[in-house]
Amino acid sequence: LPVPDYTPQTVATREAELNAPPLHAEWHEAARQRHTRDRLAVLSGVWKSILVDRILATVGADRFSAMPDPSLATNPFSAICRQLACLYDQGPPSVTNPTAEARGFDVAGLTRTITRAGYWARMQAQQRLVLGLREVLVHVAIDEGRPLFLFATPDQVVARARPERPDQPVRIEWLRKARVDVAGAVAGTPAVPELRREQWTLWVWDVADPEAPYHRVYALGQGQWRSSGMGAAAEVSGIDVTEQLLGGRFDGDAYPFRRRPTLREERRAAELGVPAVGVPILPWVVYHAAPNGAAIFSAYDEIELFDGTLDVAAKQGFVDHAFLDASWPQRYVIGAVPVGGSVHPDDAGHVAHVPTDPASVLILQKLQDYDGQPMIGQYQAGADPAALQGVVSGQIEALATNAGVAPSDVQRLGGTARSGVAIALSQGGKRDMQRRYAPVFRDADERLVALVATLWNRWSESPEGLAVFGEEAPPAYPESGYEVHYQSLPLSPAEREARRKDVLERLAAGLVSRVDAYAELHDVSREEAAVRLAAMDGPDGDDDDDDADDLREELVAALAALEGALGVDGLPRAAREALEDARDQARAAVEG
């Protein structure tokens, strides 16, 4: 049989088939891009060429030619990531900012804006990508007062960080397609619409030097591209088309993505007689699947699950081959020949074809030149598909365990051996996964809410925003201090009763406060529980509530700790400013 058109040469063209962005010239960046691209293909269902590569490497071309077309049905990598991604299943998380709300800021309005833009709904699907690719980046922009969220996978991005904070990018390079007039950019003339051609471009945001940030766009050539360094020393192998695509330059003070100037920055600017500008920021948020303080990307984490998926999918192809072609006894004939059947033409003439299906009846005729008694027999079946399938299912369950899924949290769908592929988490297992991933995603979500507030404030202060609001003063949102709390999966009646009984018993024994008990029962923060209890108690409630006193004491202690931290010499400027903002918020909460 001829080998299907899945040779390594045709498989190597899958980057072009998937319209993948060009690879970086540095080998480690290119390797990361390729590996991430393969993971994305498996998660997206376009990985047949990758699977064929693995089968060819496992069994060789001759044995592969006898196998059926590879099936993509066995994909534990995608299935497990889908089951683990349950943090946003119960709807949008609650977003609070106790300090800002006490000052009268409309935090609920910002929350509604983000929800209506569809962000939390999209995160239900994007969390699966984060878990599979280990990182996903989100670009935030404001268009006519509405936030826009663009998700970028790591194979489209190169990011750089300072050595002292290797997990926080200060430069992001994003590969995107755009229509540009390269000749006009080289000549320095206005772009001609008829000469614009779609090609890969590199969008760069750089805040490595807070005094000289910039946002630029470069048109890339064919093949690999190069970039190195950051700040003023950065180099890119492309043609600058910033003015052609963005309509201007955004370097230095013209860089638009900034936080609101602090009082200290305003005083410093007034002394120098220049306008006050805030600290430049990147309009990006990086989502991690696990805490990673050593690097921005962790592309090879959990590679066992990805590699194991290719292994079991290749073995599943062999199981299918055994089931279709070797699961019944093979017949043999000595001294006789089958008769009848259908005749099919071929290159050499006409060939008679007699199907030997297990359900067929063979009519045999003795060979004229055979002197002995014809013999008919059969060998045993070449393979036991049930036993082979059991091995594959066991490996899939082992992959789920290695991914952090406890066997007690897995409920199988169906009763067949192959149901091991369709692993589903129980409700209790999903709640465990929510608790596992909430701290990691909460940090990114809180950064994103603060980033939306910051960019919205800058937009509302721009001529476009002022034109929308006219004489009415646009609302301003706080640019820090947000807290995100996720909605956990509901408990069953039995689980709910057991939790209520346990909390009430501990409350009666004096082991927890009312605030802690309410927070545990309703799955909210301690601060929000205190606010709700105060509202329930009403204006005639006990002003000497122990929980309120405890909360105030904690705020006073935090304020003292912040004052002490600010007294340390040699603090970096950014760290000192962050501490000053936190101190101001704590002081306002104590005074309020």
Model features per residue range: what roles?
Residues D516, E520-D547:
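Long, highly charged low-complexity segments enriched in Glu/Asp and Lys/Arg with interspersed Ser/Thr
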Residues L555, L559-L562, L579, R583-A586:
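Generic L/I/V-rich hydrophobic alpha-helical segments across diverse proteins
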Residues Q244-L425, L466-A473, S480, H485-L491:
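Extended, charged amphipathic alpha-helical segments
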Residues A548-L559, A565, D569:
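Long, hydrophobic or amphipathic alpha-helical segments
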Residues Q127-L133, L137-S298:
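Extended, regular secondary-structure scaffolds
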Residues L425-R506:
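Extended amphipathic alpha-helical segments with heptad-repeat/coiled-coil character used for oligomerization
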